[in-house]
């Protein structure tokens, strides 16, 4: 297992690569802040096929590199990303009254996701991934979702408040053979 924390200034961006019995996997978590977005997006570009891209939450220091990566591929039609996990994306809408950077980034990400899914660049976009689900077991590894709960997502749905948007933050535990990785 190879875990590559990217130099993303004060933000988060992580690449996890490993081999199971049946295939090699690449998982990407978050994309770092605007000042490293191009650097992170270019690294993601060199990975080849990405099996799973996880966005933990919508803060700018987690989302900018992913926005840049998706923007670079807005016209691509070949599948490059197997699954994208983003909670609450269907709840984001653009509102001139609430024109904060976080809302704008989240709205732009949602537009990108819809476009890339429609054009085949992303195979599957999963929303509503919660700790209430069974572990995800594939080949010889397992992913446990530790948060958020369904209750937190329902509260987000009702409030549409920027503070609640960040409570969709996903905590994941990944288990593989003798490795255990806890990711925010």
Range-by-range predicted roles:
Residues 1, 73-184:
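Flexible, acidic/histidine-containing loops and adjacent segments that form or flank the divalent-metal
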Residues 15-16, 63-67, 95-98:
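A short acidic (Asp/Glu
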Residues 17-20, 69-72, 152-153:
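Short regulatory "switch" loops immediately downstream of catalytic or recognition motifs
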Residues 24-25, 34-86:
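Active-site metal-binding motif and surrounding structural segment of the metallo-beta-lactamase
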Residues 25-34, 56, 159-169:
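A signal for specific C-terminal beta-sheet/loop modules enriched in small/flexible residues
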